[in-house]
């Protein structure tokens, strides 16, 4: 039996319902300071120095200036019932993602995991922004506040709250997703597009 495609009116209705759930936060970011400036502040205060070291680690501020401060390495769809890994390597050819698609079974619970590194300076107010399109119509926009992070050798991981994949005949089909990783300074650390296909079963 052929899948029933949603009409333009139904897509507009979905977009309107999702728009009602969007909230803008009136937030003014603090003035940015470099790691070196933070380490120099109150450097004679031993307890404060130890606190900063615990917070920031022993940071080498002379990191290669040619390497981006923030590198987003992977996007993973975390789903306990998935038959295999659902992962995008964001250090490679981003254009290739437009030609492939994740398959997600309708109604399953999943989370999005973003893996990233911070190399030199503290980054304040990082956000993961996701716009979802169906047949060229934007039906959803979600902003996730990732937070502020300092440099370290190990990768950080950010997990979105648990979500449920859409379900039902009208929900099945292909979705185009435009993702962006940004911060308080509106620096575009990485933007990429990827595709998601909602199916009745993992493989049908």
Swiss-Prot record:
One of its GO terms (molecular function) is GTPase activator activity. It comes from Mus musculus. The modification N6-succinyllysine is found at residue 141. One of its GO terms (biological process) is Rho protein signal transduction. Gene3D superfamilies: Coagulation Factor XIII, subunit A, domain 1. This is Rho GDP-dissociation inhibitor 1. InterPro entries: Ig_E-set, Rho_GDI, RhoGDI_dom_sf. Belongs to the Rho GDI family. PANTHER family: RHO GDP-DISSOCIATION INHIBITOR, RHO GDP-DISSOCIATION INHIBITOR 1. The gene is Arhgdia.
């Amino acid at each position: 039996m052929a899948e029933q495609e949603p009409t333009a009116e139904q897509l507009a209705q979905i977009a309107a319902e999702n728009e009602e759930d969007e909230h803008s936060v009136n937030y003014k970011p603090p003035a940015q300071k470099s790691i070196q400036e933070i380490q120099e502040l109150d450097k004679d205060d031993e307890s404060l120095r130890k606190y900063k070291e615990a917070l920031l680690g022993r940071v080498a501020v002379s990191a290669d200036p040619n390497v981006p401060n923030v590198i987003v390495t992977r996007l993973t769809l975390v789903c306990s019932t998935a038959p295999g890994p659902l992962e995008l390597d964001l250090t490679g050819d981003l254009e290739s993602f437009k030609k492939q698609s994740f398959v997600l079974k309708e109604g399953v619970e999943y989370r999005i995991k973003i893996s990233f590194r911070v190399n030199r300076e503290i980054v304040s107010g990082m956000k993961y922004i996701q716009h979802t399109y169906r047949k060229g119509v934007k039906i959803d926009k979600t902003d996730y506040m990732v937070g502020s992070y300092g440099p370290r050798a190990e990768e950080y991981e950010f997990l979105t709250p648990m979500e449920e994949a859409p379900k039902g005949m009208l929900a099945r089909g292909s979705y185009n997703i435009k993702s962006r990783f940004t911060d308080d300074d509106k620096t575009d650390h990485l933007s990429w597009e990827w595709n998601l296909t909602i199916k009745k079963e993992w493989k049908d």
